[in-house]
Amino acid sequence: MNNLILVKYASEIFLKGLNKNKFERKLKENIRKKLKDIDHEFITDQNRWFIKSEDLDGVIERVKKVFGVKELCLVTQVEGDFDSIKEEGLKKIKESKAKSFKVETNRANKKFPMNSMEVSRAVGGYILSELGDEIEVDIHNPECKLYVEIRGNAYVFTDKDKIKAVGGLPYGMNGSTMVMLSGGIDSPVAAYLMARRGVETHCVYYHSHPYTSERAKDKVKELAKIVGRYTEKITLYVVPFTEIQMDIIEKCREDELTIIMRRFMMRVACELSERKKIQSITTGESIGQVASQTMEGLMVSNDVSDRPVFRPLIAMDKEDIMDIARDIDTYETSILPYEDCCTIFVPKHPKTKPRVKDMIIAERKLDIEALVNKAIDEMETFIFE
């Protein structure tokens, strides 16, 4: 008998038709990268994936964070005969100390002499005969579900042996995006959600030294590292933004400051994406959450983008976003009290319904191309693996 980890990938991958093999290969590649310093063996048994290792806890901790993996199951491998299956099933039920149970069988090996229903009945009957009045069958609400997978070998486990994973699609299968990362709660969640859909994720942070401290920058670097735990690696570009902000403050109306700054952030992200061959922009904006995130404000920001702008949080409540932040371990870092460039120089009464034509007129006073290029030329680059 061997204890193995059964890897179940997202059902969405099954629907990829002729591209299914590409997604499977990428997912296997990503799993192997996560386990590069853990001794392990990858086993395929009739289209099921298993991992064998002396460090099962270490494997579980890493693989459950691989995008595309839906669930992990700690299974016991036995010989593919009924006697071995029933004995291991009895052992699992005894260990569970449950008062009721149900058996579910998946017989992929069609050479096995019993079908799935017959195996479930026979294993259940054997357990009842051995445990007598200690336990009963409950097919609707059992305390313990016993699962039997019959392939080349047989694999037995219970619902207590299941570990939920992150799901999604294999990282790197769906293009690339530049996430406008701040030190807040929202943008790290947006980065995570895009990565979860298989999008290669890069980040840009706008740093307003000396108005924002080095601790604010360190906070954003830490957020990028946390998101990077779910990806192969993550790159953070730190762009100096003070000169742009001061020029806007000097030459533009106060109520237009926020939206013009947002337009410059979008321009910088687009130009940086062009240089790095990144296909899209992602922000952590949610409709109506703050004054600049009205429908009109978002349209005015989009106006300066030359590529798709994704907003994965657009219809989410703040509480929902905070829940995800807690789940992915960014929340405690995000709430550290260090200001970013979005929280300084905020006008008392920002425009909530800006118009593109008004912004174009206001920006004529600014040397847009020179400001954008200078900021990018002076940026810092950090790579976290």
Curated annotation (Swiss-Prot):
GO cellular component: cytosol
Enzyme Commission number, as recorded: 2.8.1.4
Keyword match ATP-binding: yes
Chief place of localization: cytoplasm
Family matches, as InterPro entries: Rossmann-like_a/b/a_fold, ThiI_AANH, ThiI_fer, ThiI_N, THUMP_dom, THUMP_ThiI, tRNA_STrfase, tRNA_sulfurtransferase_ThiI
Annotated TM spans: none
GO function terms (MF aspect): ATP binding; CCA tRNA nucleotidyltransferase activity; tRNA binding; tRNA-uracil-4 sulfurtransferase activity
Highest classification ranks of the organism: Bacteria, Bacillati, Bacillota, Clostridia, Eubacteriales
HAMAP family referenced in this protein's UniProt entry, alphabetically: ThiI
Record's subcellular location: Cytoplasm
Protein name: Probable tRNA sulfurtransferase
Domain of life: Bacteria
Keywords from the UniProt entry: ATP-binding, Cytoplasm, Nucleotide-binding, RNA-binding, Thiamine biosynthesis, Transferase, tRNA-binding
Catalytic activity annotation: [ThiI sulfur-carrier protein]-S-sulfanyl-L-cysteine + a uridine in tRNA + 2 reduced [2Fe-2S]-[ferredoxin] + ATP + H(+) = [ThiI sulfur-carrier protein]-L-cysteine + a 4-thiouridine in tRNA + 2 oxidized [2Fe-2S]-[ferredoxin] + AMP + diphosphate; [ThiS sulfur-carrier protein]-C-terminal Gly-Gly-AMP + S-sulfanyl-L-cysteinyl-[cysteine desulfurase] + AH2 = [ThiS sulfur-carrier protein]-C-terminal-Gly-aminoethanethioate + L-cysteinyl-[cysteine desulfurase] + A + AMP + 2 H(+)
